[in-house]
Amino acid sequence: MPSFDIVSEITMHEVNNAVENANRALSSRYDFRGVEAVIELNEKNETVKVTTESDFQLEQLIEILIGACVKRGIDSTSLDIPAESEHHGKLYSKEIKLKQGIETEIAKKITKLIKDSKLKVQTQIQGEQVRVTGKSRDDLQSVIQLVKGADLGQPFQFNNFRD
């Protein structure tokens, strides 16, 4: 029976390239001349720390980072940006988490969405991915279109397509 997996993954190498591009763009921006501003990637914790001297510049820095991520093919919804910034002395910072894997809550939403569509497929939650199995390829392709069209706040990839 044909099947595929729904996953949510980010290539850390691409995130690293996006952070480097954002830092390069930061060094050439006139409004950041003489300002202490840094974008750092922590690959072990899967976070990006953005630090600068004012709250407004912090938002500008995040926009630069999002632009660099989009250029590298990383969906902006895979960045979990906190609403509040941390304030330490004269510096403001935000710790942006990278969304890897599908949380159980979102996996249940995907399963419910697929079951409500009345397509003849079965879904299984397997850790941080959802396996979809059906009798025909057309049903599986319909599921892919359904999940792509749903706004679940996270980008999804479809891999392991087997006949």
Swiss-Prot record:
From the UniProt annotation, give the residues forming the signal peptide: none
Q: Which residues form a coiled coil?
A: none
This protein's name: Nucleotide-binding protein Asuc_2113
Q: Which cellular component appears as one GO term in the record?
A: cytosol
Respond yes or no to whether keyword Nucleotide-binding is given for this record. yes
- Protein's organism: Actinobacillus succinogenes (strain ATCC 55618 / DSM 22257 / CCUG 43843 / 130Z)
Sorted alphabetically, which Pfam families does this protein's record hold? Answer: DUF520 (PF04461)
Single Gene Ontology MF annotation: nucleotide binding
Please give the function described in this protein's UniProt entry: Nucleotide-binding protein.
Q: Does the keyword Nucleotide-binding apply?
A: yes
Q: Which UniProt keywords apply?
A: Nucleotide-binding
Family the UniProt entry places it in: Belongs to the YajQ family.
